[in-house]
């Protein structure tokens, strides 16, 4: 007795359906594993999901104070502080494009000085990053002091290199022309160096809440930043860079700030971040086929 074509198609269709379900499930789980999102509308006084370094603290008003302030909220000089999200970010993978990401934070800078200093950064660094020695003031808590690197006979060169493996967007309130700063407050993009690759004049407004938005387009390989205050025009800066060639595969994201002889409050009111590493579809199919 012959077997109908319809009866032959049933098991084939069932197999195809099951295969597509496996592919979909595997692809979805990989995408989830390579995504990260967090959002702080305020900061608790004992944040378990932040790594606080140096003088960084959270206060009773739900703010993140990156640099030291007195009991009455006045800024203190010679202070360095950083805050990093506890979970690492998968920024690139051999079988994938580099992750795209968006970060936004709101901030408040206040100063009794005519010239506030020194600034705030959003940065990406090694997962084990710590505040480098001598990185206060103009170095924004990110890079070791050049004199320490050149002159120390006890230098751990691997540690020095790792400390420099940083990508950052700086909101630089005090121009240090001796390290390549323009002669005015500016927004800059730093690639493994405190000497910014690209800058734009920043009309900084003390005592007003500002918003910084940083994004990376992994297709265009463009890092961009927009800083604005309500009711004013924004400052925009961008630079083309392949993060695959600059950063390790796994990183942490953070905020840093410093003060020096001159001082300012470096208060963070909110902070959010989203990253997405899109895997190669053919790689997903190969993984699914062996499940």
Swiss-Prot record:
CDD domains, per the entry: lectin_legume_LecRK_Arcelin_ConA
Annotated keywords: Calcium, Hemagglutinin, Lectin, Manganese, Mannose-binding, Metal-binding, Signal, Toxin
Post-translational modification note: The mature chain consists of residues 163-280 followed by residues 29-147. Concanavalin A-like lectins of the Diocleinae subtribe undergo proteolytic processing referred to as circular permutation. The propeptide is split into an N-terminal and a C-terminal part, the gamma and beta chain, respectively. These are then religated in beta-gamma order to form the mature alpha chain. The beta and gamma chains can often be detected in cell extracts.
GO-annotated molecular function: D-mannose binding; metal ion binding; toxin activity
Residue positions binding Ca(2+): 118, 172, 174, 176, 181, 208
Residues binding a carbohydrate: 138, 174, 228
Functional pH dependence: Optimum pH for hemagglutinating activity is 8. Activity drops with more acidic and basic pH and is lost at pH 5 and pH 8, respectively.
Temperature and activity: Hemagglutinating activity is stable after incubation at 70 degrees Celsius for 1 hour but lost at higher temperatures.
Record carries keyword Calcium: yes
Prodomain residues: 147-162, 281-291
Family membership noted in the UniProt record: Belongs to the leguminous lectin family.
Further comment found in the protein's record: Binds one manganese (or another transition metal) ion and one calcium ion. The metal ions are essential for the saccharide-binding and cell-agglutinating activities.
Protein name per Swiss-Prot or TrEMBL: Lectin
Organism: Dioclea lasiophylla
